[in-house]
Swiss-Prot record:
NCBIfam families: PRK04053.1 (NF003140), uS13_arch (TIGR03629). One of its GO terms (cellular component) is small ribosomal subunit. Signal peptide: none annotated. The gene is rps13. Residues 134-163 have a biased composition (Low complexity). Part of the 30S ribosomal subunit. Forms a loose heterodimer with protein S19. Forms two bridges to the 50S subunit in the 70S ribosome. The keyword Ribosomal protein applies. InterPro entries: Rbsml_uS13_C, Ribosomal_uS13, Ribosomal_uS13-like_H2TH, Ribosomal_uS13_archaeal, Ribosomal_uS13_CS. One of its GO terms (biological process) is translation. GO terms for molecular function: rRNA binding; structural constituent of ribosome. PROSITE patterns: RIBOSOMAL_S13_1 (PS00646), RIBOSOMAL_S13_2 (PS50159). This is Small ribosomal subunit protein uS13. The keyword Cytoplasm does not apply.
Length: 172
């Protein structure tokens, strides 16, 4: 087969469709849970060319990438690169991708709500959690405009009436 026939424009990676025309690190970064730095580390550890397109990789290379994360072989990188260090239940360092990451984060938030920690209370109230200011930013709901009092409206109408009547006298 020639190179043109082997090129895949859409590659299935971690149960997600990824653009095959992108370079390998950038294409890996499109998967939820894998950032650019993690993608570069994976490419380096597996000995892949970072300048190749994802669609040019063989099926074995793609399986190698998937197995690298699922078989916990990512342990070869420093622990600060994991996206889930010292798991609450097991105590081990993990790197989660796609639906696993979403599931664990959702469970963490529900656990914090259940034990009524500060973060859990903030989550349950729909407020900011990480110490940001909330006086002016992060407002939700319908904006309420400023309404004038009836006295202010009457005074404004009176001024308009005086201005219009005063203008007519000058002309006449």
């Amino acid at each position: 087969m020639s190179q043109q026939q082997q090129f895949k424009y859409i590659v299935r990676l971690f149960g997600q469709d990824v653009d095959g025309t992108m370079k390998v690190p950038y294409a890996l970064a499109m998967v939820k849970g894998i950032g650019y730095n993690t993608a570069r580390a994976i490419v380096f550890k597996l000995g892949l060319d970072k300048d190749r397109r994802l669609g040019e990789l063989s099926d074995e290379d793609i399986k190698k990438i998937e197995n690298y994360l699922t078989d916990k072989k990512i342990l070869e990188v420093p622990n600060w690169m994991y996206n889930r260090r010292k798991d609450y239940e097991s105590g081990i360092d993990m790197h989660l991708v796609t639906s696993d990451l979403i599931f664990y984060v959702r469970n963490d938030i529900e656990r914090e709500k259940k034990i009524k920690s500060w973060r859990g209370v903030r989550h349950s109230l729909g407020l900011k959690v990480r110490g940001q200011r909330t006086r002016t930013t992060g407002r939700t709901g319908v904006t309420v405009g400023v309404r004038r009092s009836k006295a202010a409206q009457a005074a404004q109408q009176q001024q308009k009436a005086q201005a219009s009547s005063g203008g007519e006298k000058k002309q006449g």
